[in-house]
Amino acid sequence: MTTTNRPIRRALVSVFHKEGIEVLAEAFIKAGTEVVSTGSTAKRLAELGVKVTEVSEVTGFPECLDGRVKTLDPHIHAGILADMTNPDHASQLEKFGIKPFDLVVVNLYPFADTVRSGADEAATIEKIDIGGPSMVRGAAKNSATVAIITDPNDYALVASRIENGEGFSLDERRWLAGKAFAHTAAYDATINEWTAKHWPKPASIEQPVSEGETEVNEAKFPATFTRTWDRAHVLRYGENPHQQASLYLDPLNQNGFAHAEQLGGKPMSYNNYVDADAAWRAVWDFAPQIAVAVVKHNNPCGLAIGATVAEAHKKAHACDPMSAYGGVIAANSKVTMEMAESVRPIFTEVIVAPDYDADALELLQTKKKNLRILKVSEPPKTKTQFRQIDGGLLVQSTDLIDAPGDDPNAWKLVSGEPADAETVRDLVFAWRAIRCVKSNAILIAHDQATVGIGMGQVNRVDSANLSVERANTLADGANRTKGAAAASDAFFPFADGAEILINAGVKAIVQPGGSIRDEEVFEAARKAGVTMYVTGTRHFFH
């Protein structure tokens, strides 16, 4: 035992979750520790044989206001906050007849669990803990002499230190204090996230907008971000083997992709999560139509809509079978045996879907033992995106393809004849599909399926060339660009990019427009008799 160790002679215990408390109870009994406790915690400890002093006996005041006030009393908080290395603090406690605590054990009201349960506002507010965080923060501040425990996983450690009489060293108490402050910070951040959503700024409160700034939705873009995530899994490694990585979960959301149920295969990797999330979001861009996406390195190898999920997969895979090797497959409809049979011979890292037919699942589980099989119960709901930059954070609303220009009825015809119904269908498909393609992006589509994708190039000409090349060199001699539709995620700065598509036989193009050379681009389409629409909406994706 070092000179900074303080034996645990007196403990304050107040926990909402009682699981594991019997470990502490046994240690308290063996060591003869004096225990002060509240309400249901005191009752449970007494049932376990611990001699317990109720908080109300210490304070001389009963719990009141339906339990809202229990421990908020100087007889409790002075015992927590007194630094017993300070003689003046010790003498003041003696003067007021207050005994110090060596250990405080607290876990808080389950606010996040209450929110996730769908409880109404009144019930949710009642699960905002006041006394608990006050005790935790007080004990953490006074780590000079008090050990604070907020994590039930530490109960066994505490029990061993109680029984052997060592207590904790100063460094250990400081480490526990850091955990405690992280716990209360996360708790408050979760409450803040809920209040920001449910208690927005009323119209009666006017706040001036600084010159040069844009008015902002305070619910989505508050002055200070205090969101919190809880570590759920330590991953084998990050994007590369020399990088560390973990998966964190939003405590207020238990239905998102990060909470996917894994039904088979190896553990998910960092790259698996990135690609599968991209694929999952891509297929839901087409709901309620049945869609399948094949994604690799966060870019689609193929996307398609089909009358059945098996047909959609077949069409998506046909876009680029070579790149699909080692990719991720997502479907927005239940995976059938027919689709599972077509997936079986293809090396695939992950498949994600809302559900699986029993025979399809059995086939995938038994014939593709390494395939990670994910089931996600709900479509994506993320409406805000975050990207960390050095020293800061960029926040934006999610591109949900819901801008005015995403409605084909709002598109402006700038060249050629109005497209027929089948071509319009392919243009709409291409326009929605290009949202998930890394910029600069050109996408060629036919029969509501991608046939050529040019992605991630630093100029639009290269993207156009790549889309045509992929469409035709991967087509076993067939000309998949002739009579197809194409989309560009941003305007053509010059006519050359559009001319590549036109010369390849594309008959209709949709693009945002907005270039200072728009007329040159439009004229190139007019000369070729190609239909061109402009949307006024851009879909960059970086």
Where are these regions (language model features)?
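Glycine- and Gly-Pro-enriched alpha-helical subdomains that act as flexible
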Residues: 301-322, 443, 449-498
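Active-site loops and adjacent core secondary-structure elements that bind or stabilize anionic groups
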Residues: 153-404, 423-433, 437-441
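N-terminal glycine-/serine-/threonine-rich phosphate-binding loop
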Residues: 1-58
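C-terminal binding/interaction regions
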Residues: 347-374, 380, 494, 499-542
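Cysteine/selenocysteine-centered motifs that mediate thiol-based redox chemistry or coordinate metal-sulfur cofactors
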Residues: 329-330, 336-345, 475-512, 516-518
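Active-site/ligand-binding-proximal alpha/beta "capping" segment
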Residues: 84-140, 412-421
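Glycine-rich nucleotide/cofactor/substrate-binding loop typically near the N-terminus or early
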Residues: 40-111, 206-211
